[in-house]
Amino acid sequence: MSSTTSIDSIPATAVFPSVSMPVTVVLTGVLLFVIFAGFFSLFLWQFLLNRLFTTWNLQRTPYGDLIHVATPPENTGLDPFIIRSFPVFHYSSATKKNHGTECAICLSEFSDEDTVRLITVCRHPFHSNCIDLWFELHKTCPVCRCELDPGMIGSGRLESFHNTVTITIQDINHDEENPPTAGSSKRLIEASAWRFSRSHSTGHFMVKTTDANVKSKRRHYQTGSCVSFDELTRYEGAGWQWLGDSSHISRIEV
């Protein structure tokens, strides 16, 4: 009887100790974090697998062959031989600085010690380093977009040859307007089927007459080459005209 009383007198808290509230909250949070991390890992792994298989399928043709990656395009720049044909000079050697005072690529004004390259097709000057970098990816003038591609220039020359005829030059000993003088003669230049030629950069025209007889006193045709800016400006002021080649000029001298 006494033993039964002693067992009943033991408090229930001693057999089943109570768990505090903070511990319960911490355990619940850890459990939720583990569940969330597991679902997130599964979702991320599935996404990566789908991305990998999609990329692999896109690289294969319906016949099972791999699609080869396209090779990068070839160099689309101007031929170095054409670039070297444009004259290079020091800006200090230019007596007439009327071809431009700044580089259109770097927008810096030319100084006397700068090395300038002149595009003789359209007469636009640039720093040599700037225009050389430009020509690595382009075939046109940065200012006027004049086509400098050798194929285009060649086709233009070929067309010009088809549009011209042979010039016949003959000596004559008399003239209806002026009597002949001793030691002098005149030449009759006959030309036909000549067309207009125009500079696409400046818009200037050079009109060639059709079925015209041109008379001149002892005129002769000269060609030459120049490599300095002074020669370019002197020839330009004296009436020299550019023929197709960028390194040669020609004129009709009286």
UniProtKB/Swiss-Prot annotation:
TM segment ranges: 25-45
UniProt KW Transit peptide keyword: no
State the annotated membrane topology for this chain.
Answer: Single-pass membrane protein
Compartments where found: Membrane
Return the InterPro entries for the record: RING-H2_zinc_finger, Znf_RING, Znf_RING/FYVE/PHD
Keyword presence, Coiled coil: no
Recorded catalytic reaction(s): these are: S-ubiquitinyl-[E2 ubiquitin-conjugating enzyme]-L-cysteine + [acceptor protein]-L-lysine = [E2 ubiquitin-conjugating enzyme]-L-cysteine + N(6)-ubiquitinyl-[acceptor protein]-L-lysine
Pathway given for this chain reads: Protein modification; protein ubiquitination
Its Gene Ontology biological processes? protein ubiquitination
Task: Report the GO terms under cellular component.
Answer: membrane
Q: What EC number(s) does the entry state? A: 2.3.2.27
Among the Pfam families in the record, one is: zf-RING_2
What keywords are assigned to this protein?
Membrane, Metal-binding, Transferase, Transmembrane, Transmembrane helix, Ubl conjugation pathway, Zinc, Zinc-finger
Please give the Gene Ontology molecular function terms for this protein: transferase activity; zinc ion binding
Judging by the UniProt lineage, the source's domain of life is Eukaryota
Q: State where the RING-type zinc fingers lie.
A: 103-145
Notes on the domains: The RING-type zinc finger domain mediates binding to an E2 ubiquitin-conjugating enzyme.
Similarity comment? Belongs to the RING-type zinc finger family. ATL subfamily.
Q: What is this protein called?
A: RING-H2 finger protein ATL28
Q: Which gene encodes it?
A: ATL28
